[in-house]
């Protein structure tokens, strides 16, 4: 699912590295917290993976961006976890 959301960058976390136990391949991600400027619980955590992590270098705190995202869920132990993955950004202010 491709969606566009607009928000103000509030926090850019450090890049995290994970290793797949089976394949021993490394996986990188960076989480960015944005505020959608709505009244109730408007904070949202967006993830940047692998090659898209470089996009976070263009982000500036307290600036407004348009984020092109894909949302997906994965099941693990009868629980579902949702990811919001960003693949394109555009500065609006």
Where are these regions (language model features)?
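Single-stranded nucleic acid-binding surfaces, predominantly the OB-fold ssDNA-binding core
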Residues: 1-93
């Amino acid at each position: 699912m491709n969606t566009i959301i607009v928000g103000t960058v509030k926090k850019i976390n450090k890049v995290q590295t994970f290793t797949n136990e089976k394949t021993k391949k490394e996986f990188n991600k960076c989480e960015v917290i944005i505020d959608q400027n709505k009244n109730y619980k408007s904070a949202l955590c967006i993830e940047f993976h692998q090659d898209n992590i470089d996009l976070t270098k263009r982000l500036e705190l307290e600036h407004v961006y348009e984020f092109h995202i894909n949302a997906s869920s994965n099941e693990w132990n009868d629980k579902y976890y949702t990811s919001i993955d960003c693949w394109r950004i555009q500065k609006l202010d």
